[in-house]
Amino acid sequence: MADRKTPLHMVRNIGIAAHIDAGKTTTSERILFFTGMSHKIGEVHDGAATMDWMEQEKERGITITSAATTCFWKQHQINLIDTPGHVDFTIEVERSMRVLDGAVAVFCSVGGVQPQSETVWRQANKYHVPRIVFVNKMDRIGANFYNVESQIRNRLKANPVPIQIPIGAEDDFKGVIDLVRMKAYVWEDDKKPTDYVEKEIPAELLEKAQEYRAKLIEAVSETDDSLMEKFFSGEELSEEEIKKGIKAGCLRMSIIPMLCGTAFKNKGIQPLLNAVVDYLPAPDEIEAIKGVYEDGTEVTVESTDDGEFAALAFKIMTDPFVGQLTFIRVYRGSLESGSYAYNTVQDSKERIGRLLKMHSNKREEISVLHAGEIGAVVGLKNTLTGDTLASEKDKVILEKMDFPEPVISVAVEPKTKADQEKMAIALQKLAQEDPSFRVNTDEESGQTIISGMGELHLEIIVDRMLREFKVDAEVGQPQVAYRETIRKPVEQEYKYAKQSGGRGQYGHVFLRIEPLEPASGFEFVNDIKGGVVPKEYIPAVEKGCREALQNGVLAGYPVEDVKVTLYDGSYHEVDSSEMAFKLAASMGFKEGARKANPVILEPMMKVEVETPEEYMGDVIGDLNKRRGQVSSMDERNGSKIITAFCPLAQMFGYSTDLRSGTQGRATYSMEFDHYEEVPKNVSEEIIKKRNG
């Protein structure tokens, strides 16, 4: 087997995560440029960035799919996962966070902490991803490094510690002061972008540099007792000790190292790459991933080349030249092309075709993938996003990823009958790639319904059908994913008995139906004593309840946040069957739910609007008209920030209305937050419309 080219401790799996316009793609591009992988720098403005390789991204100038790219810096292998910054694609971010070991969070020096940055930050916290901060666009008017520092502290409740401070800002931004080495790095505009000059710290900035270095030393000393002792006895810490302390704090997430620059003008990228290598973790420096066996036994999977193979499939893509690509992160052991692996989630054996290392949209064929590496496999038949591939000798299942339920649906139909089959194939492929996108058929109307995380999400799906699969589709009005639940506990008996010649049917259940906390889903409890309902019929009772949950009693929407306890019943030696108990439970649940004060729930979106002050009254008035509840008002860079919770049903077409109401000067972001009970008058309308 081929030996590793890069030792495990010199591998970095990192993501670049940011708000939509912080300059993330440009930063990724510059990283590829400076590490020597791409010769002409791609620019998002002219739609040519190497990372943004899907057509729609080039047009919209936003990054949709995380392309995994390998590059090298100072003998270290950096696997760069580009994550999208748009709210409708949080699933992509979530999915890439899952396989990252560290992240570079990019913030705009003017915009600072934006709503999307908070979402991405929360996801990085959830997966314990250590990160460093790069404050980008230091050359823009209004650039303020220190503002961003205080916003990260106050809004993200983190501990940002600058390891650099800027020399100048806006047009006057020249470079950075390295607080570890106490040197200035200056990029001179007439020189090549790869060159920077190391100088002494300018006299007028020396005091500020000393103040920030003192803060850095204090933060570093708290990471280690021996450093703390040195700090208190007034001894100088060496450069090595400071670096060691920054890394320890970064891995524990007690320190977030902060750097700055302007990717567009090629300033600050080399020190950023040095920080990635110096402070972000190697695969063997993070907590081992947890796994389970089929019988529920838990196990930790250490990142090592020894041991049986285990990897996580985190993304599926259709490539126009090689067909389906499955991106995997290898956690343990290694995988050779031409070998076999076992999908422990689908319980099926997979043949490993070719193995590829991706450079944005160019590919390099390799013979083996080692622990800690990320690559793409060609030719997997049954593997879905979130599945585990493992050795047949050790059938471990790595943690599953949580995928959000879609909140918006539209009906789609092809413009020509001939495209019907092509559309079905296209949608199936797209659903395989993206677990937050669902396809189903409406039983009553026979229409194909697609569901996703927001209007933009579904627009891009329809767009991709046209571009990649040449299917032109008509799209219906967006529909909201309502839910139903109950508000009071009830007890319900139901007997299902049929005697009409031959063998009868008999199932008899007593159900206790109770409401649960929001977002708890469904819970089934078997509380049968003394075998009054035999063991073998219990699963049928649960199945009957689960089936009844699919269509609520008010308007046929799925029911959630309900607990059902089977506490009594009876059976018949001859006539009882699984079918009879399933029907008894299903009908009993429906009858009970009618008495349990059923209500309709609707998805509430968290909406954040940034508007010039003169339109603030109009914006709030409009949100109130949409049944929105304003939760906070803030000020950022001279604009007003309004945060509100609004029903999704009232938010269709909001971007057009907001644009025309503010002459295009306001911007907004919207993401699903929670489900909430619908007001009575709206509920009656929904029921009337559904039940015709």
Curated annotation (Swiss-Prot):
**So where does GTP get bound?**
18-25, 82-86, 136-139
Coarse class of the protein's main subcellular location: cytoplasm
Q: Which InterPro entries match?
A: EF-G-like_DII (IPR053905), EFG_II (IPR041095), EFG_III (IPR009022), EFG_III/V (IPR035647), EFG_IV (IPR047872), EFG_V (IPR035649), EFG_V-like (IPR000640), G_TR_CS (IPR031157)
Q: Which UniProt keywords apply?
A: Cytoplasm, Elongation factor, GTP-binding, Nucleotide-binding, Protein biosynthesis
* Residue span(s) of domain tr-type G: 9-284
GO cellular component term, pick one? cytoplasm
GO MF terms, alphabetically ordered: GTP binding; GTPase activity; translation elongation factor activity
Pfam families, per database record: EF-G_D2 (PF22042), EFG_C (PF00679), EFG_III (PF14492), EFG_IV (PF03764), GTP_EFTU (PF00009)
Stated name of the protein? Elongation factor G
User: Which species is listed as the source?
Assistant: Campylobacter curvus (strain 525.92)
